[in-house]
Structure formats: structure tokens, C-alpha cells
């Protein structure tokens, strides 16, 4: 199999990278109707598998789970989760031949084996669904021509997909039809019904492509969503402790600081996040973010280039073939860091203190979000896709750190995201550790910015620069569909 994207000519590559249309609410008037009365079989019962299945069943669909024989015989976690929630469970051979839609929600590294196992069992004219297009785009999986291949990609972890549905809402979602596999022209109808069944139509749906979803998803998770949070956590903790800050306080400031800071980002974009600072602190955060963007732009561009070319995917798949040697080593190294092993702080940190004492962290968020967005757009990805894969998902990932530090983030995200996270963080930490971190001033981290003097013209220009960044305009539009967003921060 060959990387699908690399088999396309330049015009085709650009067309698929740039495929992005924000769908109108009335396009989902039939909601999940197209799939009602049909059999949906989900392969895999992890976070996305279970929670999407629960939503689909509550939306009136006939949902069952196909698991490997050994998973059923040994009553593994996937079998227990499916049966405890009242779903029908069977082997591939028992359930796949009956399915109108087979939804593959296993980890990326298992996709080829799963697809090759289920394809011969699928009836003529059935549909195959994904929630991430890595197997189609990067692996280049060939699917039988009578099978329709679609994607519904919620832009949140599986737990959030369920919680938002239970609240009568949903999470923003990308949908796509593989152009090589839509023999009956029903792919979009299937994808729309599946998205509606998970509740995604209530929060906004983008009609995208497998290519655009994969390339933007990989870029977001490697850089701002995971890599920048990991690098920032390690750098900020070590800096605070080296300057005499109590390790427990430093740990709590960082662990819960990302979540508190990005809650403002979620509600009102970079503008609101920066507005939580005093005017002197805002000016300092802006200056630091501009420095960070200049230093890190080549690193962000390298990650985007390696994602576009397939270099990243080929490297990761080589590690799969080597029993995840690099991934497991990086995971072990992260577990040994001082931040991960710091004592817990029993005291209280107020919400505003996280902002006042986290000017550098705010600068890192601003720089990372803007760089990820700009780099994706410069590579042909449409602004709406770039927004969802940078700013939108950041509070959700920050929330995982608030639960159990970097360990929890790396457990919750996919192995693909975790691998890319380590690649980025392992380069970003030494890049920033020396000259930049050594140049920090009192008030950048762990203390409030001193002084009150502000130049009006400078403040005016900085405010205009923040509010006029393209991500703020597209964010304002997309957040209009998410007016019922719940508050997720739990800092204290």
C-alpha cells in the first residue's frame, strides 16, 4: 500500500486539503433518519467506540459491537464495557455480514488488520466508517469498490462526545466521503446521519475530506494541543523550581493553570484570554508571544512539512513495526520528569492568580495557537479546519492535565497523537531552554507583573493586533454555534 495523498497530483492534493464547508442547520433536518432501520456494527469499544455507540443508540439506531473472538472469550475491557451497557456483542463473523454500516473505531495502528479482517465479511454495497482518516490517507488502505467509505470525526475526546450529547448538545464534527469509494452516491447522506446520531449537528459540522482531516489533525495534536502543553509544563516547572518556588505550588500552578487559562480561550478566544490580564501584563505576554513565534516558527513548519510529505507517518509506522520502542521509551522518560513526580499543593490558588502568575504560560498558548493556525492555513488547509484543530480542542486537552498531569493527557490521546507530541516536545524543550528561558523577567512566571505604567498607543496597537488575527474572526463565527458550551475548568 502507498500513501494515498502522495499518489495524487498537485491539483488534487490542493483540492482535498482545501475542502471545507460549514454546513447549514437545515441540512440536518432529517437528523439520523437515513440510518434508522439499518444495522450499525462498531468495531472497537474504547472511548470513541463506546460513547459514539451510546449516542447513536439513544438517537434510535440499531447498534451492536463486533469484537475479536479472544476479547469475548477472555471477557476483556471492550467486552465488559459493551455488555455492561446493554449492547449486543458478537464476533466479526457473526455480526459484520449483517451490517449496513461498519464503524472502525479501533486505534490507528490496528486499522489495517481490522479492515482486512472485516472486508471479506461485509455484504455488497455496505458502508465502512472511520473517525480518523489515517488508515485511508497515510497507510493508503484499499477498500473494495462496492463499499462506501465515510468519516465522522468529532473534535473532542470520546467522553466529551457523550457528556455534551446527554446535555442535549453535541461537539463540533468534521464529516467526509472518500472520493475513491462512493459507488452509490450515498456517502454524504450516511455521514450526515451518523454525525446527527452523535449530536454533532447541534454544535456545527464541517464538510471536509479525509486528507484535510488527517493533515490538520496531526498538525494540531503534535504542536499546540499536546506538544506545546507538554513542553510548556516541563519548561515552566523547572524554571519556577530553579528560582526557588516551592515545587508543590509550581506543580499546581502549571497543572491547573493550562485549564483555567484555556477556559477563557474557549469562551472568547485569544482576545478574552489576554483581557484577563492587567494592561502591563498583557503587553508583556504579547511581547513574549512574539518572541516565541519567531523562535518556534521553523519547528512548526518542519512538523507541517513532515506531515504533508508523509515523513512523519512513515517514521511512526516504522516504530509500530519495532514494537513501539521509541514511543514506550519517551513515555517512560516523561514519567520520570520532576513535574510528574512533584508533591501536591494543598493550598488554594484563585482563578485570577493563575492568570497573574502565568504570563509566560499565556504567551505560550497564544504563540502556539496562532502558529499552528497560520502554518496550517499557509499549507492549504481552510481556516475553519485550522481553528478546530488548534484553538477549539485546546481546553479539552488542558482538562486532562488537570486530572492527572501529563500522564493523563498521554493516556487519553491516541498513540498517534502521543508519538507526535513527544517528537515536538523533545525538540521544543531544548530550543527554548537556554537563551529564551534565561531571558525571562520577574513577573513572567510565578509572580505578578510589577508596575502600572502603560503607553496608550502601545496598548491600542497590541489590542488591535490581538483582535485582528484571522483566528479571532473565524473563531467568533464558529463559537456562535457553540453558545451552550459548558464550563469545564475545575481549578482550585
Curated annotation (Swiss-Prot):
- Which keywords accompany this UniProt record? Amino-acid biosynthesis, Branched-chain amino acid biosynthesis, Magnesium, Metal-binding, NADP, Oxidoreductase, Repeat
**Which EC numbers characterise this protein's activity in its record?**
1.1.1.86
GO-annotated biological processes:
isoleucine biosynthetic process; L-valine biosynthetic process
| Record-linked InterPro entries | 6-PGluconate_DH-like_C_sf, 6PGD_dom2, KARI, KARI_C, KARI_N, NAD(P)-bd_dom_sf
MF terms from GO for this chain are:
ketol-acid reductoisomerase activity; magnesium ion binding
Q: Which GO terms describe its cellular component?
A: cytosol
Binding residues annotated for Mg(2+) 2, in chain numbering: 217, 389, 393
Keyword Phosphoprotein included in the entry's annotation: no
Q: Which cofactor does it need?
A: Mg(2+)
For this protein, the record's PROSITE patterns field holds:
KARI_C (PS51851), KARI_N (PS51850)
Task: Locate the active site.
Answer: 132
Q: Which residues form the KARI C-terminal knotted domain?
A: 209-344, 345-485
Protein name, per record: Ketol-acid reductoisomerase (NADP(+))
